[in-house]
Amino acid sequence: MIEQLNEILNSFKTKLKSVKDLNDWEELKKEFIGKDSNLTTILKSIKTISNEQKQEIGKLANQIRTTIIDNLNNKQEELKNKELLIKLEKEKIDVSLKNSSLKFGSKHVLNIVIEEISDIFTEIGFEMVSGTEIESDLYNFQKLNLPLDHPARDMQDTFYLDNNLVLRTHCTNMTSRMLTKLASLKTDDNNLAVISYGNVYRRDDDDATHSHQFMQIDGFVVGNKISFANLKWILKYMCQRLFNKDINIRLRPSYFPFTEPSVEVDVSCFKCDSKGCFICKKTGWIEILGAGMINEHVLKLNGLDPTKCSGLAFGIGIERIAMLKFNISNIRNFYENNVKFLEQFKFYSE
């Protein structure tokens, strides 16, 4: 039986050399380790031989079977790689060929709006930053006058992560970071104007006007004797530049934890000249953003002295502006990668 086992191994090695493809490989596998193979028959018959031979023959038979399986696996990998190379060679593409039907992409409509707003503010001296989308509770809430037990935290359903981290609920997190950085400089020159932009996240149910992820631009100015009149001028200047019309703005009292006083900013309807339409809901006004004077507590929490400086702040929803500018009714259109929808804005990106 030992001679028979050695003959099986030698025969396998000889036939393995002649295997050219996976079909040959399958036949070889069936012949040497299949259920009807000689090796399998020997392994089944070991229980019938004497105890003296059982250990020696059983050990040798299993070693040969392991050797055959290892060689089959290596050969299979070799054949698969060979077939892949042949397939790749057949499918090789000549990248030097010209394609007359090549289509060029364009800027996404949200990037168009971001660049337009950024240009408006950088032209009047604002610095532009982006910041991090994963933020600490400290900068996202606590340094913005939203301590752990503040009821206003319920205004924003938050995605909480581990280790007191959150997905930022607003770009105002960069306001607290930049104010803290300004305070660390310990200088008498507390003048700073910054806009920050990027994705923000809230646990909203997605529908035509809401999304769990959307984009914002936040801005703030701090310095000596910054007043509400400065805020009103900035807001009107931005709205007139953004909508390319001599529109009016209306400020309504509101509440934001990090500003006092706080206002909701409406613009006179640029679609119907304030006569009343479906865009402005027959009111002649369109709600567009929130703003206010930076709360004194926020200045203190970030290391600044409210007796020596003051500030203003505002927050703009990018999707909101894009929907108004381009008559888009469903916020989900921005994120569905529908080429027909996106191609409409190619003209604006050229």
From Swiss-Prot:
Q: What cofactors are annotated for this protein?
A: Mg(2+)
Q: Which keywords has UniProt assigned to this entry?
A: Aminoacyl-tRNA synthetase, ATP-binding, Cytoplasm, Ligase, Magnesium, Metal-binding, Nucleotide-binding, Protein biosynthesis
Pfam families documented for this protein: Phe_tRNA-synt_N, tRNA-synt_2d
InterPro entries, per database record: aa-tRNA-synth_II, aa-tRNA-synth_II/BPL/LPL, Phe-tRNA-synth_IIc_asu, Phe-tRNA_ligase_II_N, Phe_tRNA_ligase_alpha1_bac, Phenylalanyl-tRNA_Synthase, tRNA-bd_arm
Catalytic EC class:
ligase
| Note on cofactor | Binds 2 magnesium ions per tetramer.
Q: List, alphabetically, the GO terms of the cellular component aspect.
A: cytoplasm
Residue positions annotated to bind Mg(2+) are: E260
Tell me the CDD domains matching this sequence: PheRS_alpha_core
**Gene Ontology molecular function, alphabetical:** ATP binding; magnesium ion binding; phenylalanine-tRNA ligase activity; tRNA binding
For this entry, list what GO says about its biological process. Answer: phenylalanyl-tRNA aminoacylation
Can you tell me which family this protein belongs to? Belongs to the class-II aminoacyl-tRNA synthetase family. Phe-tRNA synthetase alpha subunit type 1 subfamily.
Q: Which HAMAP family match?
A: Phe_tRNA_synth_alpha1
Q: What is this protein called?
A: Phenylalanine--tRNA ligase alpha subunit
Q: Which organism is it from?
A: Mycoplasma capricolum subsp. capricolum (strain California kid / ATCC 27343 / NCTC 10154)
